[in-house]
């Protein structure tokens, strides 16, 4: 049977046994990849600094998803939150990864069994003796079972009734931890940043799935609907399944890129919009002002800013700064963050405070411009010194650090001031170790960027796949050249033109 590579799936078109076999093998591959990839990430992951070198800076992809579901401890004796782990058992990173690999092996064996023993009695129609599947009934079974799983996840796992809960944090990603979540049944449940909506929506969707599944098990589709939607054709199942997958992929691409309670910044990194809107900068400023109203000095107020919060306010953690074809973790780009140098405050020779204009997301280079509180340019690093009027030297700009490692240190040397002005364009200033990983200094994206790109791309491809297979199943008769209203017996191969008795072949 000489099939081209893009037609090979036709071998399971009318073979339910082997259709099951290839799906079980696909599950084996998915589970095996997940378990193996988790073990690889655990082998290269460094849990020593959850503040300045979290999993998303190290390019971890599987670990954030495991963590948000309630796994936080390793057999290696560490916890994602920094504490030591004591005998975490099966519900640990290694335990769950190993369970996926064992499950993958069992699926592999069952796929082989179903491929060998494909002609099972359960698949044959007793009226015709030919293989046949009751697809509406199978749809009802799957809908019911997925509804039970969905309801169980929301009602037990997320709420902590029987399970650990999920990762919950504050709006600034500082206090994240695993905890049970109560369902949010009011309007707040529709806020994508409210964790309670995860529980309530899974409970509601699960109940809907259970009811819909029971409906499809007990009510047969009308004949006209059955024929109109080609419910007896396995390619209809393929088309609608692809639709469900691409729809889900588009949704999660959005929740990942724009942020939501399901994609906490402590596990996946900040979103680009938090940089664009100065989200963390405003919170830091609010905290400093609050400290000053408590009669703290500027140095004391800045020293109270958590290093974790300051680190979010750094452009190198913006997922939109990494190019799509720059492979590797963020740490391979600008380096491993070692410490916060502190917040630089620039002043002119009259003592007026100046603010460095920050680099927008989609710029690789940006002029160094210092403005006063009214937004008027007062100093810059000129491109042509011969025509400069606002150079650091001419304006007499100085810089002093508050908080961090350089707390209380000031510089008036123009070369040093310009160095820190350039770095202040990128947000809060951090000491970065580029030697350990031979980092090249070019920004990389976080797992948030990679996940979004991958899912948006495949959603688009699957959308076209849905259109393709939907058209094939709806217009199958046209593509095959058979008139669905044809009453006459059509013998394949008897006529040169199918169904046209005037072109009957000559018997030799």
Swiss-Prot record:
Its main location: plastid. Signal peptide: none annotated. The gene is psbB. It comes from Gnetum parvifolium. One of its GO terms (cellular component) is chloroplast thylakoid membrane. GO terms for biological process: photosynthetic electron transport in photosystem II. Belongs to the PsbB/PsbC family. PsbB subfamily. Binds multiple chlorophylls. PSII binds additional chlorophylls, carotenoids and specific lipids. InterPro entries: PS_antenna-like, PS_II_antenna-like_sf, PSII_PsbB. One of the components of the core complex of photosystem II (PSII). It binds chlorophyll and helps catalyze the primary light-induced photochemical processes of PSII. PSII is a light-driven water:plastoquinone oxidoreductase, using light energy to abstract electrons from H(2)O, generating O(2) and a proton gradient subsequently used for ATP formation. GO terms for molecular function: chlorophyll binding; electron transporter, transferring electrons within the cyclic electron transport pathway of photosynthesis activity. PSII is composed of 1 copy each of membrane proteins PsbA, PsbB, PsbC, PsbD, PsbE, PsbF, PsbH, PsbI, PsbJ, PsbK, PsbL, PsbM, PsbT, PsbX, PsbY, PsbZ, Psb30/Ycf12, at least 3 peripheral proteins of the oxygen-evolving complex and a large number of cofactors. It forms dimeric complexes. It is a multi-pass membrane protein. Coiled coil: none annotated. Keywords: Chlorophyll, Chloroplast, Chromophore, Membrane, Photosynthesis, Photosystem II, Plastid, Thylakoid, Transmembrane, Transmembrane helix. It is found in: Plastid, Chloroplast thylakoid membrane. The chain crosses the membrane at residues 21-36, 101-115, 140-156, 203-218, 237-252, 457-472. This is Photosystem II CP47 reaction center protein.
């Amino acid at each position: 049977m000489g099939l081209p590579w893009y037609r090979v799936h036709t071998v399971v078109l009318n073979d339910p046994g082997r259709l099951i076999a290839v799906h079980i093998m696909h599950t084996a591959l998915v589970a095996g990849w997940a378990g193996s990839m988790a073990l690889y990430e655990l082998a290269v992951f460094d849990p020593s600094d959850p503040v300045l070198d979290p999993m998303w800076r190290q390019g971890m992809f599987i670990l954030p998803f495991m963590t948000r579901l309630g796994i936080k401890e390793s057999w290696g004796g560490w916890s994602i939150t920094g504490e030591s782990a004591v005998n975490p058992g099966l519900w640990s990173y290694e335990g769950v990864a190993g369970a996926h690999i064992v499950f993958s092996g069992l699926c592999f064996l069952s796929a082989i069994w179903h491929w060998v023993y494909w002609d099972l009695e359960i698949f044959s129609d007793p009226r015709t003796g030919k293989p046949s599947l009751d697809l509406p009934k199978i749809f009802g079974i799957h809908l019911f079972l997925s509804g039970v799983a969905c309801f169980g996840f929301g009602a037990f796992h997320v709420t902590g009734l029987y399970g650990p809960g999920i990762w919950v944090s504050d709006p600034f990603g500082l206090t994240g931890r695993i905890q049970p979540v109560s369902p949010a049944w009011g309007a707040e449940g529709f806020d994508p940043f409210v964790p309670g909506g995860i529980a309530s929506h899974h409970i509601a969707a699960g109940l809907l799935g259970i009811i819909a599944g029971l409906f499809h098990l007990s009510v047969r589709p009308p004949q006209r609907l059955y024929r109109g939607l080609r419910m007896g054709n396995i390619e209809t199942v393929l088309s609608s399944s692809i639709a469900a997958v691409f729809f889900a992929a588009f949704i999660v691409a959005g929740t990942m890129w724009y942020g939501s309670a399901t994609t906490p910044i402590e596990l996946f990194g900040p979103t680009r919009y938090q940089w664009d809107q100065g989200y963390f900068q405003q919170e830091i400023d609010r905290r400093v002002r609050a400290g000053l109203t408590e009669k703290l000095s500027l140095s004391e107020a800045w020293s109270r800013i958590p290093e974790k919060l300051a680190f979010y306010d750094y452009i190198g953690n913006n997922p939109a700064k990494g190019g799509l074809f720059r492979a590797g973790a963020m740490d391979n780009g600008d380096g491993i963050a070692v410490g916060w140098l502190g917040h630089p405050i620039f002043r002119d020779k009259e003592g007026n405070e100046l603010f460095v204009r920050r680099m927008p997301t989609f710029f690789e280079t940006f002029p160094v411009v210092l403005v006063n509180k009214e937004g008027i340019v007062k100093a810059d690093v000129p491109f042509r010194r011969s025509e400069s009027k606002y150079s650091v030297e001419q304006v007499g700009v100085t810089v002093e650090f508050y908080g961090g490692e350089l707390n209380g240190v000031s510089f008036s040397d123009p070369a040093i001031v310009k160095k820190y002005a350039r770095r202040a364009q990128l947000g809060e200033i951090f000491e970065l170790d580029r030697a350990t990983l031979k980092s090249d200094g070019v920004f990389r994206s976080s797992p948030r960027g990679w996940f979004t790109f991958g899912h948006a791309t495949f959603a688009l491809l699957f959308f076209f796949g849905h259109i393709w297979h939907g058209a094939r199943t709806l217009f199958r008769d046209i593509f095959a050249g058979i008139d669905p209203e044809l009453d006459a017996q059509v013998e394949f191969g008897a006529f040169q033109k199918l169904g046209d008795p005037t072109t009957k072949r000559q018997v030799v």
